[in-house]
Amino acid sequence: MGPISKIYFLNNPYPNGHKIVTFNWSGRIDEYGFIWFDFHLKTENYYANDDENDEEEDEDLPDWNSKIVWGNYHTCTLSSNYWGEQRGIRINNLDEKLDFDTIIKNDLFSNDLPSEHHFDDDDLAFSIYLLGHDSCAGHQISFSKKDNNRYDITWTGKIALTYAGDDEFSHDFKAEIFNVEFEGFHYPKTWSPEKATEMFRARLANFEEYEFVDLNPKSNKREYKLDKLKQ
């Protein structure tokens, strides 16, 4: 059994972190030819492995430090696409073809940490449900390639407890995710396979190393994604 994927919210009441039960890493090309990475994670219950009695907790503790408050919200979802928005981190420029292997050799940065307290949540690369619908920014994501097209991912960022009215990105998280497989590139549903082929061929280096995969072979409705050929 390999290492367990976890996310740590620094200085919260659970120093051993929280197990990640769902993690997805995919790509997407939009109508304009920009290519994005999407990430989605969900944790188990915050208190899943906590056997300590917290009935004597200080009522004056800040929300971040209170097990009772964390227990009220149960789990975390951190995602660029779970709530239907088109967020994520853009990984290409239109004037050059995207080389997947080159991209993942370097850290990704969301470059969305607001410079002032008043910010538009729609400008952020990811949404987060933590202690309510809070805000996160300043993401840095790094990849370590393993065998069989698998990767280990380290993901850090900043959190503001905006659900409680705090716009300061004063909290930090770190996620360590192991043995992850890239799930391929999606494209707009309005595109035909021919249009998708044309757009991907123009935007991706080494296009011959990819293939279109049926998302649901058992369905009468044909939908595809572009995935790397299995080596």
Where do the PLM segments sit?
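Short secondary-structure subsegments characteristic of cysteine-rich extracellular domains
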Residues: 164-187
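A short, structured loop/turn motif at beta-sheet edges
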Residues: 142-152, 179-181
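Flexible, membrane-facing loop/turn or short amphipathic-helix motifs
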Residues: 129-130, 160-166
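Short amphipathic beta-strand and strand-loop transition segments with alternating hydrophobic
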Residues: 17-28, 137-145, 158
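Surface-exposed helix/loop patches within compact recognition domains
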Residues: 35-142
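Intrinsically disordered, low-complexity terminal/linker regions enriched in Pro/Ser/Gly
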Residues: 187-231
